[in-house]
Amino acid sequence: MRKVMAAKLHGIHVTAADLDYHGSITLDPDHCEKAGLLPLEFVDIWNKNSGARISTYVIFGERYSRCCILNGAAARTCQVGDEIIICSSHYIEAERIADFQPKILTFDKGNHIVETLSYVVERDGTGRYHFDIVNEGGQSLPIPVKAHGR
């Protein structure tokens, strides 16, 4: 089994931090469902402003609120307005990598979804892997992809 990236909210902004809550990150269920994140799923969080890296679990907040709230100890790692990356991972058999297409959502400063991307891995007849980033229209994007919404 290999640990692979399963879903990512890239460039979402922290809307609140609640030190007195007992842990987790509260997210808009609409964002989570579009990316494939489940309630109680463990995620890694990377703060683009400070470089802090933490892990916690997802809880759903109010639908369509565009919330991104760090709770409990996680609240110490992010400030309101910080741009973060939230990433989940799954374990899969290496042979299944070509069947697996994680979703990546990118955001503007108001936490509106700017783009929905997919990571696509294919294996050719010689056994070599090929990686592509594809937008909703099926168009391949250059690698690395520059984040939009800035």
Swiss-Prot record:
Substrate binds at residues 56, 72-74. The active site is at residues 24, 57. Keywords: Autocatalytic cleavage, Cytoplasm, Decarboxylase, Lyase, Pantothenate biosynthesis, Pyruvate, Schiff base, Zymogen. The keyword Cell membrane does not apply. One of its GO terms (cellular component) is cytosol. Is synthesized initially as an inactive proenzyme, which is activated by self-cleavage at a specific serine bond to produce a beta-subunit with a hydroxyl group at its C-terminus and an alpha-subunit with a pyruvoyl group at its N-terminus. Its cofactor is pyruvate. It comes from the Bacteria. Belongs to the PanD family. NCBIfam families: panD (TIGR00223). This is Aspartate 1-decarboxylase. It comes from Beijerinckia indica subsp. indica (strain ATCC 9039 / DSM 1715 / NCIMB 8712). The gene is panD.
